[in-house]
């Protein structure tokens, strides 16, 4: 569980940096909120190389655990983190039960640029019963956009990001994959 959290912390290092720049501390803070039943893991010789989760309208892959966030980030940043992450992690998905929502796609730095994310996506989608899949990505994450496009995801919506300047991106791009 902690290794999955560490992979997420490293993969979303820039996003978590406003709360904490220490990946291990971020991992410790989010570990208790992970719903491991929703995660898929790429393992290379016993080392977690990458992770992703598939959620749906019946439940998400993570919760913002206020006590853990306060413990690891301090009182003020813990409260701020809870507020920010609750929206990101726990918002009810409005997609039908036939749609899988892919989130937390992350590959450890030492394993990047080896096709691991694409392989994880393809394999995990085959293991589910969803008819289609949706994910979102920031407009500045060009490597992820290329990866998703290469396996058949297509953009269907863009939403301007509130406080985008502070977050370092302007829009969230929503992409869909439909089984053929």
Question: Where are the regions that the model predicts?
Answer:
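Conserved acyl-donor/pantetheine-binding loop and adjacent beta-alpha core of acyl/acetyltransferases
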Residues: 58-99
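Active-site rim helix/loop that mediates acceptor-substrate recognition in acyltransferases
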Residues: 19-39, 44-45, 53, 59
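Conserved acyl-CoA
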Residues: 88-97, 119-132
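Conserved acetyl-CoA-binding loop-helix of GNAT-fold acetyltransferases
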Residues: 109, 113-126, 146-150
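C-terminal "cap" of GNAT-fold acetyltransferases
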Residues: 131-145, 151, 161-180
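Glycine-rich phosphate/pyrophosphate-binding loop shared by adenosine-nucleotide-utilizing enzymes
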Residues: 46-51, 100
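Helix-loop element at the rim of GNAT/NAT acetyltransferase active sites that forms part
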Residues: 5-21, 58-60
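A short, internal acetyl-CoA/4′-phosphopantetheine-binding micro-motif in the GNAT/acyltransferase core
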Residues: 71, 76-79, 103-112, 138
């Amino acid at each position: 569980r902690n290794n999955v959290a560490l992979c997420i912390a490293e993969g979303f290092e820039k996003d978590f940096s406003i709360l904490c720049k220490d990946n291990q501390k971020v991992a410790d803070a989010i570990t208790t909120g992970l719903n491991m039943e929703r995660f898929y893991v790429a393992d290379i010789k016993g080392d977690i190389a990458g992770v992703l989760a598939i959620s749906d309208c019946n439940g998400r892959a993570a919760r913002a655990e206020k006590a853990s966030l306060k413990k690891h980030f301090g009182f003020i940043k813990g409260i701020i983190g809870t507020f920010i992450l609750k929206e990101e992690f726990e918002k009810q998905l409005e997609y039908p039960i036939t749609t899988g929502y892919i989130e937390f796609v992350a590959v450890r730095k030492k394993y990047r640029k080896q096709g691991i994310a694409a392989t994880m996506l393809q394999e995990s989608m085959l293991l589910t019963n969803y008819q289609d899949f949706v994910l979102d990505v920031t407009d500045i994450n060009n490597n992820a956009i290329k990866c998703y496009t290469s396996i058949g995801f297509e953009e269907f919506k863009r939403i301007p990001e509130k406080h985008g300047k502070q977050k370092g991106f302007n829009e969230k791009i929503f992409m869909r994959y439909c089984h053929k």
